[in-house]
Structure formats: C-alpha cells, structure tokens
C-alpha cells in the first residue's frame, strides 16, 4: 500500500473567492506535469501530503510502485488540475528520473535547509531538468524544513543567490507547519499560466502528475 492510499481529486475554490456560478465561466488549460526532485529525506513527499491532505507525519508506510494524485484549483480565470509526480531520492532510482523529466512542465527542486549537501546537489537536479527540457519548463528551487531554523545550514540569502545564478524561482517552506506550501503551488501555477502565449482550448485542463518510487522499508517525512 502506498503512503497516499488511492487517487483523489480535490476541488479548492474558497481560497480564490469564487462562487459556484462563476466557476462555469472559467477557462481550462492543456495538459502539464509537475515533478518534485531532490535528495532523499528533504521532504518532497511531506510537501505533497501537506498540500493534498493538510497533514504531516514523520513516519509512514513506504510507497511501493506508483502513486497518482491530483488536485483541481481555480486560479485567476483558469481551472488548474494539478497532478503531482514524486520521485525517490535514493541513488538506485536516479536512472529512472530522466524519462519522467522529459514531458514535465514544472520542476520543483527541493533541499533541506538543515543539510548543506542537499543544497549543493540542487545544481545537479536543475542540470538534469534543463538537459531534458531546455527552457521549456518552470523551475522552482525550494528550501524545506524552515521550522528547524535553529539547525539551519543554508541561509535564505544563499538560496536566493543560487536561484538568481540558476535563473529559477525560489521559496522556503515548512511541510511540518504548512508555511508557504499553498503559496508554492499558487506561484508555480501562476508561472505556468504566464508562459502560455495563446488562449488555451476551452475544454482542456492543466494536469501535473505524480508518481513516487520509494525504497521499501520505513522512511521519514521530516
């Protein structure tokens, strides 16, 4: 059984102040895909769990096989269906990742602010994305676990500087407290919308997909 259970679709309109009658007038987008990348234990799965279920756990049953999660939200005048792909950080799974990058539209590269090595490895992940997708992708550099600020090894200024050098977006979050998690998804969805240079088909949707490949055994979300 997976960490997430089964596929779920969520409709979230309250945060955007929409009435039911207004939703019928909204346009939708073509398919896309959001991919989470980063080293093991940086909190990729925890961020997804916080966004999908508003929950956090330091230990849960390991994911076996593939999970698919989706969440539909309303942003500006568009319906955005987020389908999230979660990749395992273990070295044994790294050879699988390029095939999942190839059709991605958004890549979120995650590091742990209490682990300087995970921060150093973000260059590698961004290089992988650009090698497969060039400039046809939105990239967000994400520093997670800011609830552990007293153990911080990477400053926000260092994260911002690296994001400028790599020409990517930047944000810090806490999957544990939920700080900035919704903002993360709003920002990447907005960035995706801004890359659309022509009006999307009325019947389409933005789809950003999630698959997770995790090593068997106990793991930590923290």
Curated annotation (Swiss-Prot):
It catalyses: GTP + H2O = GDP + phosphate + H(+). The keyword Nucleotide-binding applies. A lipid is attached at residue 222 (S-geranylgeranyl cysteine). GO terms for molecular function: GTP binding; GTPase activity. GO terms for cellular component: cytosol; endomembrane system; Golgi apparatus; Golgi membrane; intracellular membrane-bounded organelle; plasma membrane. Keywords: Cytoplasm, GTP-binding, Hydrolase, Lipoprotein, Magnesium, Metal-binding, Nucleotide-binding, Prenylation. SUPFAM superfamilies: P-loop containing nucleoside triphosphate hydrolases. Its cofactor is Mg(2+). It is found in: Cytoplasm. Residues 58-66 are annotated as: Switch-I. Its EC number is 3.6.5.2. Mg(2+) binds at residues 45, 63, 86. Switch I, switch II and the interswitch regions are characteristic of Rab GTPases and mediate the interactions with Rab downstream effectors. The switch regions undergo conformational changes upon nucleotide binding which drives interaction with specific sets of effector proteins, with most effectors only binding to GTP-bound Rab. The small GTPases Rab are key regulators of intracellular membrane trafficking, from the formation of transport vesicles to their fusion with membranes. Rabs cycle between an inactive GDP-bound form and an active GTP-bound form that is able to recruit to membranes different sets of downstream effectors directly responsible for vesicle formation, movement, tethering and fusion. RAB41 is required for normal Golgi ribbon organization and ER-to-Golgi trafficking. This is Ras-related protein Rab-41. The lineage of its organism: Eukaryota, Metazoa, Chordata, Craniata, Vertebrata.
């Amino acid at each position: 059984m997976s960490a997430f259970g089964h596929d779920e679709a969520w409709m979230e309109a309250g945060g955007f102040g929409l009435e039911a009658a207004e939703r019928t007038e909204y346009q939708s987008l073509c398919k896309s895909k959001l991919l989470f990348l980063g080293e093991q234990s940086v909190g990729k799965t925890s961020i997804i769990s916080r966004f999908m279920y508003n929950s956090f756990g330091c230990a849960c049953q390991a994911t076996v096989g593939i999970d698919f999660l989706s969440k539909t939200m309303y942003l500006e005048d568009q319906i955005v269906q987020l389908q999230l792909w979660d990749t395992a950080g273990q070295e044994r799974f790294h050879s699988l990742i390029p095939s999942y990058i190839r059709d991605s539209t958004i890549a979120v590269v995650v590091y742990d602010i209490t682990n300087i090595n995970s921060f150093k490895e973000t260059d590698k992940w961004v290089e992988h994305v650009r090698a497969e997708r060039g400039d046809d992708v939105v990239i967000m550099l994400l520093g997670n676990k800011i609830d552990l600020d007293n153990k911080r090894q990477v400053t926000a200024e260092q994260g911002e500087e690296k994001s400028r050098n790599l020409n990517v977006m930047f944000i810090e979050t806490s999957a544990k407290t939920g700080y900035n998690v919704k903002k993360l998804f709003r920002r990447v969805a907005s960035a995706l919308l801004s890359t659309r240079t022509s009006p999307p088909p009325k019947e389409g949707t933005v789809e950003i997909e999630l698959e997770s490949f995790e090593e068997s055994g106990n793991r930590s979300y923290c």
